[in-house]
């Protein structure tokens, strides 16, 4: 039995912060001395018997409850940090019984318990580490890439592989498949990917815990076999040699040489889409296939409903299992691909057009090298990383570029009680700015000054200090100097909301004593951040995420990804817009003369965008969280900061009414992830509540001035938070609460610790006490 085997483990993993400092590895480099870098290390000598037993108990608890609470609770590093800091929760918990009132003292006790717990989780660099995974297609490409290049057992030790298999087993659905994300319904894409991953990691065709391989293979064959896998799966399995390139729609590398006046041009694409298809087109243009090993031949036999050599590959190009299909390809798309497949591609493989293909591959590789250098070989994200790395290996298996990629693989690994996975690339800055704001809201400054100072230093150290190298606009890039990334400075890709929240924290702490929070940020660096935000506003007043929006909306019809949406071009987002309003409003108060007219115009247009993007029911669609509750919290915050009130703003009244109408019987809020793909509000099954979403709704109502009209809904929500708090001061892990590209959900493990604290802090400082009895 898998769990019994794990009881014999006598060694432990450790989370290391800032690894690489003083390292003589010539292939590992950093722009700011690896501040915020997170890597896991297996220590064969670590751990007392009690510590190992605690880890094992966490694993078994997750396994027993894996179909009830789907995401892990991210406990391994928390246990480590709490042990290292000798954390003991000294404040006893207080519960609010039915018929009792909530007093200021009860709210304060709950708040202090949460603050002390969160403070203990801060890293030595000043940020809060956390899992940022969830999609179940993140890890297999790394395994495939390292298998192809011969580095699988070199980069991933036996302990790494054991924990990766644990993650796969623990997140297998009861029907034998794997969802697009943790807890999602089974899909061909992720079931095939995880089956192949298990086999590459050493499992036999009938191996795996609880017959994992046999069950998943049956699911695949029962649903049509690998020919029904979506396009990204077709691409990766062609690279691996388990599928055939002639069963893929064309991805011509000539695209990267298109003139800029064309409506279809790389500079007009969303950066993530652009940098996914860039290396894919290189691999497609070369029709690269990895070594055909006996294992690859076995996989060809195991995963199709007909003999591999008898498959008519050209007819499989447009196939996609119904379980995976969210964004069906249009007839125009199919005609375009067919014309490329039957006319253009045959020409480009023949002389003299073959020379054009060769030149295009060189141009594509030039762009790949540029992006690698600009990101210290982290690349933009985990979907792109193995593609970029493989392209470098194909160009030169012994080259420095490939070795620099290898040195950054461990930045993507994350370990929890549910095993080891690939996560995005880290959410260090994002989690830090929210943790800092929640702590600031607590008004317990005298107790947590050292925590605030370290967090402030991390935020300042993580600001991007330069634009992308060279002629970055020619490389389809936008300015980045003064921005903040989602993770750390090395990553290099600034994001508007990360920039706005980072700027807000620095501005707020510039008003506090330097003896408490450290020296304020230099004015020029603040101005650089403001410049980033001003550059990101569109004509409609909205703010985009990574690069200025403006491409024609019809380009989205060319979306080739069957299971995601809104990923071809940049859009404006209510969340990014509201964050920018918050930061620039505070900047305007503190630096009233700097670009005064531009900022006033920006704020006016941004407020108009929020008002115009409201749904008829009063909600706002959240693009990065689940979903309407998340978007509504942001929008109400932005409107309130801009000076709008419930009495003079219809949008604010409608937003508050939406939240009041969706409050659950227990006083909380709970929204299903199905709201995201369906684009309409859907409550959690059984109308149960989620504490993170409850916190967002509470803060949204507070921004609307609900406490002045009727504080009862806020008291009811606070009662739920207070009574749900754990013994150590944390809050329990529940459903995933974040999303991206409309149809995929993702885990932000720090949300459960940050947002309930923040909501209680706002509640304690702004809602009158005592509450009525209820």
Curated annotation (Swiss-Prot):
GO cellular component, one term: lipid droplet
The protein's Enzyme Commission number: 5.4.99.41
Keywords: Isomerase, Repeat
CDD domains, alphabetized: SQCY_1 (cd02892)
InterPro entries tied to this protein: SQ_cyclase_C, SQ_cyclase_N, Squalene_cyclase, Terpene_synthase_CS, Terpenoid_cyclase/PrenylTrfase
Family: Belongs to the terpene cyclase/mutase family.
Protein name: Lupeol synthase OSC3
Species annotation: Ailanthus altissima (Tree-of-heaven)
